[in-house]
Amino acid sequence: MKNYKAIGKIGEGTFSEVMKMQSLRDGNYYACKQMKQHFESIEQVNSLREIQALRRLNPHPNILALHEVVFDRKSGSLALICELMDMNIYELIRGRRHPLSEKKIMLYMYQLCKSLDHMHRNGIFHRDVKPENILVKQDVLKLGDFGSCRSVYSKQPYTEYISTRWYRAPECLLTDGFYTYKMDLWSAGCVFYEIASLQPLFPGVNELDQISKIHDVIGTPCQKTLTKFKQSRAMSFDFPFKKGSGIPLLTANLSPQCLSLLHAMVAYDPDERIAAHQALQHPYFQVQRAAETQTLAKHRRAFCPKFSMVPESSSHNWSFSQEGRKQKQSLRHEEGHARRQGPTSLMELPKLRLSGMTKLSSCSSPALRSVLGTGANGKVPVLRPLKCAAVNKKTDTQKDIKPHLKHYHLPTINRKGGEY
């Protein structure tokens, strides 16, 4: 840590201590997560789930950025140098007399769902989504503290006592570790309500009280749902029937779309609970999606000025010349003939082994038939493989091609589904 100067303590948890540090190299401020665990080797450090997750998920605008990993072999100490944010969600809402505006709530929740979607698409679920682990800096929200994360493909059962009790999903409370990434959406729903109302949704004092608080609000589940929870604990599933009072409307300024998304995120049955990618398409985020699309369009015009000169309507009104239509019909005929001949054999690409510096070697390509025209001798020239040397030289065959170039209008190729 010789390259950093300690400024002050930010917070402390069970497994780590977070300090505000200043880099002596660039002068910038960072958050240093000093691990309390002793590490024996660099292999043990690299196998740490939090480091693996941050490396896989970065860069992303809503995932806390990992700047550097500092490991001292002699002392066995490990520190994660991350970007410094202003505060976490708990600090943001603590002591507030009035809730945030719905516009601000919508902005934060959209970014939280973006972070969850990115994480789940990359095969990771967090398992400890709570206000303390969600960081903000002005209008930017980032998810941090991946110390409890797991792979969505790892074998169940998982650790039973995971995530903070107030944000723990029913399947985590009622099973011996049989839960999925959908638990993150339940936790995010609880955070959603807390940001909007400044009050926790299910503040249970113990596990039994926690499940009771859930039933008080959303009611007891049907037997079909309970049978999905495998390997139940000693806790009895003979719950007295409760209809549920419904989610308390402590704030009158919440829109129907807001409440609709909130109910979808805290669905009792994880199979019926909304996923992160589905939440991003919810009507509640319509304004955010429109703003995001507009921003992307501005960036494209800034980086590709020629696109801004083309009228928008022309992008959907493609016209072909008469010669182009003929070539397109010819191309379709050739493709149909090729399909009748049977599928071509596919070659599997060799797997890359990246270790240190990777050397790239060139290989010769097979001879290709020219599409430029015939040579001086009346025969179709063949382009032979070129070997890279200090000076590129043209072959005699290539020299013959140049004065006899023939121009062709190549047909436009239609891409299915807009893929490139």
Curated annotation (Swiss-Prot):
Q: Where is the composition biased (Basic and acidic residues)?
A: 323-338
Listed Polar residues bias regions: 311-322
Q: Where is the active site?
A: D128 (proton acceptor)
Q: Where in the cell is it found?
A: Cytoplasm; Cell projection, Cilium; Nucleus
Q: Name one GO molecular function term.
A: metal ion binding
List the CDD domains: STKc_MOK
Q: In which tissues is it expressed?
A: Highly expressed in testis, and less in kidney, brain and lung.
The listed outcome for T159A is:
Loss of activity
Catalyses: L-seryl-[protein] + ATP = O-phospho-L-seryl-[protein] + ADP + H(+); L-threonyl-[protein] + ATP = O-phospho-L-threonyl-[protein] + ADP + H(+)
Q: Which domain of life is it from?
A: Eukaryota
Look up keyword Transferase and say if it applies.
yes
Outline what the protein does: Able to phosphorylate several exogenous substrates and to undergo autophosphorylation. Negatively regulates cilium length in a cAMP and mTORC1 signaling-dependent manner.
- Name of the protein described by the UniProt record: MAPK/MAK/MRK overlapping kinase
UniProt source species: Mus musculus (Mouse)
